């Protein structure tokens, strides 16, 4: 993909894989389109990490843990097909609200950083406990 630019009206639609990060960097609001149909959402962590205001539809099953964490942290705006236009208009008209949702989303990502290290440490403890029990019963 070459240079990514918004249309003259400031809007663009992207249906692509591997190019979303560049598009998210241009966005004031990111709509997770796959969450409005039968595709069950898309990963929201990239736009969250960039501090973008994220709008999702009701179908986020494939990314439920991420959606739940973002929603609980105030970093996700829920919409339906019927409410999407109204939700977007309200967000576009309110840069303070957009920024607050974006900051909240980014805070959720920051809180999750280090999860792999914590998971490995927990796995090591579980393995050590299992080995100790095995030795006790041997």
Give a label for each model feature.
Residues 1-138:
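Nucleotide-activated sugar donor-binding and catalytic core shared by glycosyltransferases
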């Amino acid at each position: 993909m070459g240079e990514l630019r918004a249309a003259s009206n400031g809007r663009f639609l992207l249906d692509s894989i591997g190019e979303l990060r560049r598009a998210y960097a241009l966005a004031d609001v990111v709509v997770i389109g796959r969450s409005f149909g039968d595709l069950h959402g898309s990963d929201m962590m990239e736009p969250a990490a960039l501090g973008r205001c994220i709008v999702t539809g009701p179908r986020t099953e494939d990314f439920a843990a991420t959606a739940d964490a973002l929603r609980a942290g105030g970093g996700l705006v829920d919409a339906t097909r019927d409410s999407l236009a109204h939700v977007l208009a309200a967000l576009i008209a309110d840069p303070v609200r957009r920024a607050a949702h974006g900051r909240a989303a980014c805070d959720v990502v920051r809180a999750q950083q280090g999860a792999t290290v914590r998971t490995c440490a927990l796995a090591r403890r579980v393995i050590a406990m299992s080995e100790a029990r095995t030795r006790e019963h041997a």
